[in-house]
Swiss-Prot record:
Organism: Thermoplasma volcanium (strain ATCC 51530 / DSM 4299 / JCM 9571 / NBRC 15438 / GSS1)
Domain of life: Archaea
UniProt keyword annotations, A-Z: Autocatalytic cleavage, Decarboxylase, Lyase, Polyamine biosynthesis, Pyruvate, S-adenosyl-L-methionine, Schiff base, Spermidine biosynthesis, Zymogen
Protein name: S-adenosylmethionine decarboxylase proenzyme
Biological process, per Gene Ontology: spermidine biosynthetic process
InterPro entries named among the record's database cross-references: AdoMetDC_fam_prok, S-AdoMet_deCO2ase_core, S-AdoMet_deCOase_pro-enz
Length: 130
């Protein structure tokens, strides 16, 4: 039986208000709010302010991580939400970010991580990484 160990949401938000995503000061409460709304366990976080504008940040979670990067000149926010355990936590954090950032267009990829767990012969399987 296939069971994943986590959900990884990779998303690009387009058409986001550039004033909202220009600074870490504006992004911090939105990202931290997503962590709370998703019922995630924050271990630590770090944010970086680009000059003249733009922000990046990562929140280390007991469940994995949430990270973002902004390009205010394009109205673009790229997001990475990876959580282990209950997949609803990643979905809830993503829903919160969508509601707060109000993108006009969104592209997403949702990946089940560790989906070979439980597969017959997994222990004997050899994986080649290039």
């Amino acid at each position: 039986m296939k069971v994943g160990v986590g959900i990884h949401i990779i998303a690009d938000f387009y058409g986001v208000d550039s004033k909202l995503i220009s600074t870490t000061e504006r992004m911090y409460p939105i990202i931290e709010g997503a962590v709370k709304y998703g019922r995630l366990t924050k271990i630590s976080s770090d944010y970086y302010q680009f000059r003249p504008q733009g922000a990046s940040g990562v929140v280390l979670l007991a469940e994995s991580h949430l990270s973002f990067h902004t390009w205010p000149e394009y109205g673009l926010v790229t997001l990475d939400i990876y959580t282990c355990g209950d997949p609803k936590t990643a979905d809830d954090a993503f829903e919160y970010l969508t509601r707060e950032l109000k993108p006009t267009s969104v592209t997403t990829r949702k990946i089940v991580r560790g989906d070979l767990v439980g597969e017959e012969g997994l222990n004997e399987m050899q994986v080649e990484i290039h």
